[in-house]
UniProtKB/Swiss-Prot annotation:
Keywords assigned by UniProt, alphabetized: Acetylation, Keratin
Organism expressing this protein natively: Columba livia
Coiled coil (residue ranges): none
GO molecular function: structural constituent of cytoskeleton
Self-association state and partner proteins as the record states: The avian keratins (F-ker, S-ker, C-ker and B-ker) are a complex mixture of very similar polypeptides.
Record's GO cellular component terms: intermediate filament
Similarity field: Belongs to the avian keratin family.
Organism lineage: Eukaryota, Metazoa, Chordata, Craniata, Vertebrata
Taxonomic superkingdom: Eukaryota
InterPro entries: Keratin
Name under which the protein is recorded: Feather keratin Cos2-2
Length: 101
């Protein structure tokens, strides 16, 4: 039994909401009750170091040397092993925004 009438949903910008919501308060009276929860014991075993050493000048995801990194570029800006700005890469894939509802 619902305590309030469902509100009219606005047109969502993105995924459809799973449920409608209302702004008016929903009041239900319940009897007093108590619940005791006893957690079970959990044993967590952490592994040792997976990579004991990792070369600093290796291009991640490649088996070639860091010299190849100067060939890679994003919108004409060379990408090298010294770190680079991801903004030009992410703007290409994440730059589009939802239109307003």
């Amino acid at each position: 039994m619902s305590c309030c009438n469902p509100c009219l949903p606005c047109q969502p910008c993105g995924p459809t909401p799973l449920a409608n919501s209302c702004n008016e308060p929903c009041v239900r009276q319940c009897q007093s009750s108590s619940v005791i929860i006893e957690p079970s014991s959990v044993v967590v075993i952490l592994p040792g170091p997976i990579l004991s050493s990792f070369p600093q000048n290796t291009v991640v995801g490649s088996s070639t040397s860091a010299a190849v990194g100067s060939i890679l570029s994003c919108e004409g800006v060379p990408i090298n092993s010294g770190g680079f700005d991801l903004s030009c890469i992410t703007s290409r894939y994440c730059g589009s925004r939802c239109r307003p509802c």
